[in-house]
């Protein structure tokens, strides 16, 4: 292979490698942004997971690609495939660093003078400003103060993972199962944020781990949709109802399959999730597997609990990636 064909093949390999690495990185680092409070948010979370453009790529949407063959050849000739991969990764990291720097809140003042209003108090719960929280509560403010969406400081701090603020709010009487306008509690928000330590703290203060939002989603549903494996594993260790269904009759396994959460699928199966459970559309998890989900279909058809643990293949198993199996 030489000339244009070699360049084309090399470019395809680059893009495949980058897509794989970006997918892995996004799943590992996924930190949900601030969510607008309407029913569309919950419905989109159910269908796509929180902010999951990577999922759309897996489903077959093509990225916009440069078409200049000369440009491709020049790029590859500069330093080879690996150098190009590293260069593009560094550029992406620089963009992430610049974005993080722009979003970083201003430093907290040494001393809070004057009263703290409700808006400032709620904003402090997001930004982790403990002194503002202390001042508001010391002046007699309610720990259950909420905004127009009934989101409290406890909800906000749970999403962000601010443990010290959470403990302070709970010590000052914050209602641990306070429901916002979508019936989400701090437990739901902690699952979205991916903070296992927050889940454990809320649980130790009596939070309901089976509470439902307006989609009838449990915290387990939310953890599955947002891809937080450790939280899913924690809930399963508690013996929660693994087959609990939401408003559309979907179990956690339905959601995991729909979003191609491979490790979570394996975890659910190893803990006895019902593969034959039907949702309101009459579909089982296996029915939802798309052709592009070869690994997922294999997991459903060959659970192999004796050789799998925590969603990972046994070291040295040597099992090849299964080929797609057409849906029946």
From Swiss-Prot:
Location relative to the cell: Cytoplasm, Myofibril, Sarcomere, I band; Cytoplasm, Cytosol; Nucleus; Nucleus, PML body
Keywords: ANK repeat, Cytoplasm, Nucleus, Phosphoprotein, Repeat
Induction remarks: Up-regulated in response to mechanical stretch of skeletal muscle (hypertrophy mechanically-induced).
PTM section of the record: Phosphorylation at Ser-68 by PKB/AKT2 in response to oxidative stress induces translocation to the nucleus and negatively regulates myoblast differentiation.
Signal peptide residue numbers: none
GO CC list: cytosol; euchromatin; I band; myofibril; nucleus; PML body; sarcomere; sarcoplasm
Tissue expression profile of the protein: Expressed by myoblasts (at protein level). Expressed in skeletal and cardiac muscles.
KW Phosphoprotein (keyword) present: yes
GO MF annotations, alphabetized: chromatin binding; protein kinase B binding; RNA polymerase II-specific DNA-binding transcription factor binding; titin binding
Biological processes, Gene Ontology terms: myotube differentiation; negative regulation of myoblast differentiation; negative regulation of myotube differentiation; negative regulation of transcription by RNA polymerase II; regulation of cytokine production; regulation of intrinsic apoptotic signaling pathway by p53 class mediator; regulation of myoblast proliferation; regulation of transcription by RNA polymerase II
ANK repeats: 116-145, 149-178, 182-211, 215-244, 248-277
Region (Disordered): 96-116, 297-328
SUPFAM superfamilies from the UniProt entry: Ankyrin repeat (SSF48403)
Entry-linked Pfam families: Ank_2 (PF12796), Ank_4 (PF13637)
Summary of subunit composition and partner proteins: Interacts with ID3; both proteins cooperate in myoblast differentiation. Interacts with TTN/titin. Interacts (via ANK repeats) with TCAP; the interaction is direct. Interacts with TJP1 (via PDZ domains). Interacts with PML; the interaction is direct. Interacts with p53/TP53. Interacts with YBX1. Interacts with AKT2.
Protein name: Ankyrin repeat domain-containing protein 2
Organism: Mus musculus
Gene name in the database record: Ankrd2
